[in-house]
Amino acid sequence: MGAYKYLEELQRKKQSDVLRFLQRVRVWEYRQKNVIHRAARPTRPDKARRLGYKAKQGFVIYRVRVRRGNRKRPVPKGATYGKPTNQGVNELKYQRSLRATAEERVGRRAANLRVLNSYWVNQDSTYKYFEVILVDPQHKAIRRDARYNWICDPVHKHREARGLTATGKKSRGINKGHKFNNTKAGRRKTWKRQNTLSLWRYRK
């Protein structure tokens, strides 16, 4: 087994003594740092490489913490001015994952970079910590790499804000196979197509 396989097995057993100790030390370290900060190297190199990271120029890792829990509706004094069914303020569940939120915040901070992917690294009672893989679209090492230069195209600006990263697509229910027939073109698009009566007019 290669070194990365051992790292992978360590991560699978998150309740093991080794990993519990490591995570406790690391989470203390992360709490002392800024909400969004650049990491020198990935905490989980095996996971980062599986998601497309390469230890070469043009690739950057940012670590970010996101507060856990529900999303409170931003209304003044809790006044929603609606029917009782829509008056909820506190117990509403955000429809996107915290990982998607983390990607979006990092994407706003490093607006000149492109978000490639992200992964979970740690959590405590208050926060979840993620590492986001970013790519510099202006760097020659990226522009000349046939595997990665697709992300230099302008249509990939702020992929994370439009639900085009892996976690964004998961939130949108977009994937392949028979389980995803009802979200193939998007949940709302499919609903509209299936609930719109279209009567074709034929002339003889």
UniProtKB/Swiss-Prot annotation:
SMART domains: Ribosomal_L15e
UniProt keywords, alphabetically: Cytoplasm, Ribonucleoprotein, Ribosomal protein
GO biological process, one term: cytoplasmic translation
Disulfide bonds: none
Biased composition (Basic residues): 169-185
Residue ranges of the region described as Disordered: 164-185
Protein name as catalogued: Large ribosomal subunit protein eL15A
Keyword Cytoplasm belongs to the record: yes
Major site of localization recorded for this protein: cytoplasm
InterPro entries tied to this protein: Rbsml_eL15_core_dom_sf, Ribosomal_eL15, Ribosomal_eL15_CS, Ribosomal_uL23/eL15/eS24_sf
Subunit composition and interactions: Component of the large ribosomal subunit (LSU). Mature yeast ribosomes consist of a small (40S) and a large (60S) subunit. The 40S small subunit contains 1 molecule of ribosomal RNA (18S rRNA) and 33 different proteins (encoded by 57 genes). The large 60S subunit contains 3 rRNA molecules (25S, 5.8S and 5S rRNA) and 46 different proteins (encoded by 81 genes).
Family: Belongs to the eukaryotic ribosomal protein eL15 family.
GO molecular function, a single term: structural constituent of ribosome
Subcellular location field: Cytoplasm
UniProt xrefs under Gene3D superfamilies: Ribosomal protein l15e
Signal peptide per UniProt: none
NCBIfam families, per database record: PRK04243.1
Function: Component of the ribosome, a large ribonucleoprotein complex responsible for the synthesis of proteins in the cell. The small ribosomal subunit (SSU) binds messenger RNAs (mRNAs) and translates the encoded message by selecting cognate aminoacyl-transfer RNA (tRNA) molecules. The large subunit (LSU) contains the ribosomal catalytic site termed the peptidyl transferase center (PTC), which catalyzes the formation of peptide bonds, thereby polymerizing the amino acids delivered by tRNAs into a polypeptide chain.
Cited Pfam families: Ribosomal_L15e (PF00827)
